[in-house]
């Protein structure tokens, strides 16, 4: 394995939680712990991205966001990584293509909040992502109905695993996705930035 890349063995189930984490907060940590419990994951990797192509303004410097993420999410089964920067990828589909090639036999699950599912159809190659990687969707307050009514939910409706069977997601063949309602921590990166509590 290349220097600076997380380690994983064939057969492991790794949840991938990507984002700019600008900044990371307790809400991110909470849904990560919930994902570990709900989706049959061995570990979760936080993929701290170099930037978000869907956001017009760039994030704080990567090293600042990485340090904050490591301070917020301290768990023995969670790794904070800048693997997208190391791979030179900017879009989720390209990241997943490269990770699948680098980690043969590892089962990846893409984790997202319900707000991301609601706009998932705007992502580059979103159908490819959903066709090749199981999706674990964690509901946030106010985002449940838009997510369930989203174009992605309609296109992949038959691939949905019921919430009561969420533990099956990690070993499911794609396309597969599961939507779970979890008690949420009311915190957001944009609210932290707007209050001046961040870089």
UniProtKB/Swiss-Prot annotation:
Family: Belongs to the NadD family.
InterPro entries the record matches: Cyt_trans-like (IPR004821), NadD/NMNAT (IPR005248), Rossmann-like_a/b/a_fold (IPR014729)
Alphabetical UniProt keywords: ATP-binding, NAD, Nucleotide-binding, Nucleotidyltransferase, Pyridine nucleotide biosynthesis, Transferase
Top-tier EC class: transferase
Native species: Roseobacter denitrificans (strain ATCC 33942 / OCh 114) (Erythrobacter sp. (strain OCh 114))
Official protein name in the record: Probable nicotinate-nucleotide adenylyltransferase
Biological or metabolic pathway of the protein: Cofactor biosynthesis; NAD(+) biosynthesis; deamido-NAD(+) from nicotinate D-ribonucleotide: step 1/1
SUPFAM superfamilies reported in the protein's UniProt record: Nucleotidylyl transferase
Function noted in UniProt: Catalyzes the reversible adenylation of nicotinate mononucleotide (NaMN) to nicotinic acid adenine dinucleotide (NaAD).
GO biological process terms, semicolon-separated: NAD biosynthetic process
GO molecular function: ATP binding; nicotinate-nucleotide adenylyltransferase activity
Highest taxon above the source species: Bacteria
Gene: nadD
Enzyme Commission number(s) of this protein: 2.7.7.18
Pfam families found in the cross-reference section: CTP_transf_like (PF01467)
Catalytic activity: nicotinate beta-D-ribonucleotide + ATP + H(+) = deamido-NAD(+) + diphosphate
């Amino acid at each position: 394995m290349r220097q600076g890349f997380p380690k994983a063995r064939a057969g492991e189930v790794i949840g991938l939680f990507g984002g700019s984490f600008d900044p990371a907060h307790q809400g991110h940590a909470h849904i990560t712990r919930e994902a570990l419990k709900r989706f049959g994951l061995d570990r979760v990797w936080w993929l701290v991205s170099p930037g978000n192509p869907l956001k017009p303004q760039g994030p704080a410097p990567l090293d600042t966001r990485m340090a904050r993420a490591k301070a917020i999410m301290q768990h023995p089964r969670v790794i904070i990584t800048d693997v997208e920067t190391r791979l030179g990828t900017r879009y989720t589909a390209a990241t997943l293509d490269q990770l699948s090639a680098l980690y043969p036999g590892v089962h990846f699950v893409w984790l997202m909040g319900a707000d991301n599912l609601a706009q998932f159809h705007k992502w580059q190659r979103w159908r490819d992502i959903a066709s090749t990687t199981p999706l674990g969707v964690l509901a946030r307050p106010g985002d449940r109905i838009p997510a369930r009514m989203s174009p992605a939910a309609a296109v992949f409706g038959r691939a949905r695993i019921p919430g009561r069977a969420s533990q099956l997601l990690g070993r499911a063949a794609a396309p597969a996705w599961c939507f779970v309602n979890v008690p949420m921590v009311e915190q957001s990166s944009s609210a932290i930035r707007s209050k001046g509590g961040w870089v």
